[in-house]
């Protein structure tokens, strides 16, 4: 009997890459591969890459240098190792990757993962194995589905891609060029994926897409469904305790999405809503197609639907031409909104984007100083948000055992880690926890009950269950 071949995948970047990595594992599992945590022991190493920032793509080439040594060592011991570069760097740079790193055997863009077995076979025959086209077929219809055992091993929370690509063309962003135009999966296929996950014990579904609330998939009635309508359908699936979605664009928040937050108890009151800047001048230069006031109105609409809703966001400091006045407008917006969490980055020019050719670059010193000021404000808001949980009872979905013996960790509705002393038989349940204290970014508390309440009926309005 031929021993299974070993596969190691290292992913960089977004949630979509995490999901894509899992689907590559499933697809290659059908070809006889099993995962290994040791790249040096692998027959195939895949780097699933991110192209959003320069540092992320340069990390890939540093890693390829290390893998070249591992590949040479494997060859000396009589073992063939293949190296594949996947993801957005693969899509953007294509053949340039093999020019810079000849040790690479396969280059495959994010829309072609279902062709990996054929590409690996081509490489084994010494043929060129590069695919960075946007094929007409839907890759999701060809990717292997995970086994029940694989789903269980990945935990009680899972990602499901519902949408890929972006048509917004923000001037700083490579996504429209690396992921292509917006494409939405049919509702029926999404529902099938979610049902397979919940049948295997998954309790939290996160619907993901580069611009997820631009979702416009074909419904079972033959009509185009929006994300809001899709959320109602997902909430009907038995076993779904929690629903999330990411990442959103303010311009695609419609009444149906707001209504889903109002009506569906399964939809978590936590929205990742990137804004990037609080300066209208910079927002225009970014081609965001909304103002700071437009963004505030979207936030107000969400808060009108649920008063317990909280937000996270993304911010870029040092965009070309950003002045101190522009930056202060961003700080003012953060003050006005009040975030539970946020992610901040220094502007990084990406080749091929309009912003890369803009003049008036902000100095590295100014970027560092602004990033520190912005992050300090975000950290203080996050600390205040977490501190406000002390003394309250919050629902926690328990996910796994913690590092401390006898302790479990789960997530609140706002994705805060929550730790309690409890037995592992409550993993997968949503239980009330009284929060007693904080430890850095984690909440510490005690179970109030050890029996989970029934998952609410689908689309049950919040008002009908009290509170």
UniProtKB/Swiss-Prot annotation:
It comes from Bradyrhizobium sp. (strain ORS 278). Its EC number is 2.8.4.3. Its cofactor is [4Fe-4S] cluster. Residues 5-125 form the MTTase N-terminal domain. This is tRNA-2-methylthio-N(6)-dimethylallyladenosine synthase. [4Fe-4S] cluster 1 binds at residues 14, 50, 88. InterPro entries: Elp3/MiaA/NifB-like_rSAM, Methylthiotransferase, Methylthiotransferase_CS, Methylthiotransferase_N, Methylthiotransferase_N_sf, MiaB_methiolase, rSAM, rSAM_horseshoe. Catalyzes the methylthiolation of N6-(dimethylallyl)adenosine (i(6)A), leading to the formation of 2-methylthio-N6-(dimethylallyl)adenosine (ms(2)i(6)A) at position 37 in tRNAs that read codons beginning with uridine. It catalyses: N(6)-dimethylallyladenosine(37) in tRNA + (sulfur carrier)-SH + AH2 + 2 S-adenosyl-L-methionine = 2-methylsulfanyl-N(6)-dimethylallyladenosine(37) in tRNA + (sulfur carrier)-H + 5'-deoxyadenosine + L-methionine + A + S-adenosyl-L-homocysteine + 2 H(+). Pfam families: Radical_SAM (PF04055), TRAM (PF01938), UPF0004 (PF00919). The lineage of its organism: Bacteria, Pseudomonadati, Pseudomonadota, Alphaproteobacteria, Hyphomicrobiales. Monomer. [4Fe-4S] cluster 2 binds at residues 166, 170, 173.
């Amino acid at each position: 009997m031929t021993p299974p071949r070993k596969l190691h995948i290292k992913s960089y970047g977004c949630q979509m890459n995490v999901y894509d990595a899992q689907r590559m594992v499933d697809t290659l599992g059908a070809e006889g591969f099993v995962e290994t945590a040791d790249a040096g022991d692998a027959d195939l190493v895949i780097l699933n890459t991110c192209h959003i920032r320069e540092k992320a793509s340069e990390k890939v080439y540093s890693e390829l240098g290390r893998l070249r040594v591992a590949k040479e060592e494997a060859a000396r011991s009589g073992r063939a190792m293949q190296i594949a570069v996947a993801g957005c760097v693969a899509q953007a740079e294509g053949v340039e990757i093999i020019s810079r790193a000849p040790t690479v055997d396969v280059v495959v863009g994010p829309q072609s993962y279902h062709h990996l077995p054929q590409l690996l076979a081509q490489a084994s025959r010494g043929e060129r194995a590069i695919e960075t086209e946007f094929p007409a077929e839907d890759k999701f219809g060809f990717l292997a589905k995970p086994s029940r055992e694989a789903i269980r091993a990945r935990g009680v929370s899972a990602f499901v891609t519902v949408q890929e690509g972006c048509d917004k063309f923000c001037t700083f962003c490579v996504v429209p060029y690396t992921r292509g135009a917006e494409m939405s999966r049919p509702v029926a296929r999404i529902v099938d994926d979610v049902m397979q996950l919940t049948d295997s014990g998954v309790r939290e579904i996160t619907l993901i897409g580069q611009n997820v609330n631009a979702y416009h998939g074909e419904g079972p009635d033959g009509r185009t469904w929006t994300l809001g309508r899709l959320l109602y359908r997902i909430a009907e699936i038995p076993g779904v305790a929690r629903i999330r979605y990411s990442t959103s664009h303010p311009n695609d928040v419609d009444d149906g999405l707001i209504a889903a937050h109002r009506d569906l108890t399964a939809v978590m009151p936590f929205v990742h809503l990137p804004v990037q800047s609080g300066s209208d001048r910079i927002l225009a230069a970014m081609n965001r197609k909304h103002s700071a006031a437009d963004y505030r109105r979207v936030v107000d609409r969400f808060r009108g639907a649920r008063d317990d809703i909280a937000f996270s966001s993304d911010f870029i400091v040092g965009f070309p031409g950003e002045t101190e006045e522009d930056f202060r407008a961003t700080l003012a917006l953060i003050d006005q909104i009040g975030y539970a969490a946020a992610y901040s980055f220094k502007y990084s020019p990406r080749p091929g984007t309009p912003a890369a050719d803009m003049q008036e670059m902000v100095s590295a010193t100014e970027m560092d100083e602004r990033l520190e000021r912005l992050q300090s404000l975000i950290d203080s808001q996050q600390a205040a948000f977490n501190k406000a949980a002390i003394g309250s009872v919050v629902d926690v979905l328990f996910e796994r055992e913690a590092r401390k013996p006898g302790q479990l960790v789960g997530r609140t509705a706002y994705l805060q880690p929550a730790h309690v002393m409890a037995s592992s038989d409550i993993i997968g349940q949503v239980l009330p926890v009284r929060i007693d204290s904080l430890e850095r970014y984690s909440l510490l508390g005690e179970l109030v009950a050890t029996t989970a309440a029934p998952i609410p009926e689908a689309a049950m309005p919040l008002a009908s269950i009290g509170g």
